[in-house]
Amino acid sequence: MDTENRSRADLALPNPQESSSAPDIELLEASPAKAAPPKQTWRTFLKKELEFLGATQILVGLICLCFGTIVCSVLYVSDFDEEVLLLYKLGYPFWGAVLFVLSGFLSIISERKNTLYLVRGSLGANIVSSIAAGTGIAMLILNLTNNFAYMNNCKNVTEDDGCFVASFTTELVLMMLFLTILAFCSAVLFTIYRIGQELESKKVPDDRLYEELNVYSPIYSELEDKGETSSPVDS
């Protein structure tokens, strides 16, 4: 019994008024979790390539303008068959080049300054440029079919200026077709990106409104609970 009482006496309960000799435990603030890396989507990929798309359109426009200038300065368009030089008589290498250069220039400027009027202007210019490029592709394909049909008739002809012009312009038309397809893809991709950006900017205020409602809803519920608990006491 004595040993049991001694063992109980040795067990001293801690006094809350006495300062504990044990070292204070430092409370470490939980470091905030690292933000997850942004999800890679087609829009993030296009955002990195916007200036490249604009530069592509400018380059395509300048090359088409050079081709049109060379043909119109070397050849008299009115002296040859209309089917062979249909593209140049309609002036596509000139007005198409102007639209490509303009849309490419606005694309680069709007990406660097990112103001509202430049963004809207670049969007409209690229829509017009994509329509012009689609029209140009149809015209180029039609011109190629006319050239191939004309060159088939040149097999039995030894010397003919029209056949030489047809073979020369066919090579230029093929290169312009490739460049126009490239400009069309650039304009369409830029247009899709800008339209997606416009739609996302319209959704942001609604999302913020829902976030504010979610933040304030616990406060409102707490006030309602306090009002319900205080009403029986008042009665």
UniProtKB/Swiss-Prot annotation:
The keyword Secreted does not apply. It comes from the Eukaryota. It holds the Pfam family CD20. The modification Phosphoserine is found at residue 217. It is found in: Membrane. The chain crosses the membrane at residues 52-71, 90-109, 123-142, 172-191. Keywords: Disulfide bond, IgE-binding protein, Membrane, Phosphoprotein, Receptor, Transmembrane, Transmembrane helix. Residues 1-23 are annotated as: Disordered. One of its GO terms (cellular component) is membrane raft. Residues 1-51, 110-122, 192-235 are cytoplasmic. Belongs to the MS4A family. High affinity receptor that binds to the Fc region of immunoglobulins epsilon. Aggregation of FCER1 by multivalent antigens is required for the full mast cell response, including the release of preformed mediators (such as histamine) by degranulation and de novo production of lipid mediators and cytokines. Also mediates the secretion of important lymphokines. Binding of allergen to receptor-bound IgE leads to cell activation and the release of mediators responsible for the manifestations of allergy. This is High affinity immunoglobulin epsilon receptor subunit beta. It comes from Mus musculus.
